Amino acid sequence: MSHPRKSLDSVIHAPVRFSIAAALASVDEADFRSLRDAVEITDSALSKQIALLEEAGYVKVRKGFVGKRTRTWLSLSPKGRAALTRHVAALQAIASGAPPAGNTD
């Protein structure tokens, strides 16, 4: 049997990225400022973490204009949603001392 920690996602596991993914999982899309405020980090920290999540294919970034101002919207991709679901299941399995569902090793 394989320990559930082996199912943890190294991209999402970092606390800030986990918080970002969890926040995006609860909405269809969030604007940059709202997400920054929800996760309580700086603009530069959010930009850096979003770049890593986007590179992994976990987050989609959409830019547009509201009036004359540039606005950035973020959403969790299907790949990101699946990774978050697996990661949370692994955390729950670790916390409960049981193997993750579907693990027959």
Feature names for model-found ranges:
Residues 1-5, 19-23, 79-105:
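Amphipathic alpha-helical dimerization/coiled-coil segments
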Residues 61:
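Short beta-strand "wing" residues that participate in macromolecule-binding interfaces
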Residues 57:
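Glycine-centered, phosphate/nucleic-acid-interacting loop/turn motifs that mediate DNA/RNA or nucleotide
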Residues 4-45, 64-75:
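N-terminal helix-turn-helix DNA-binding core of bacterial DNA-binding proteins
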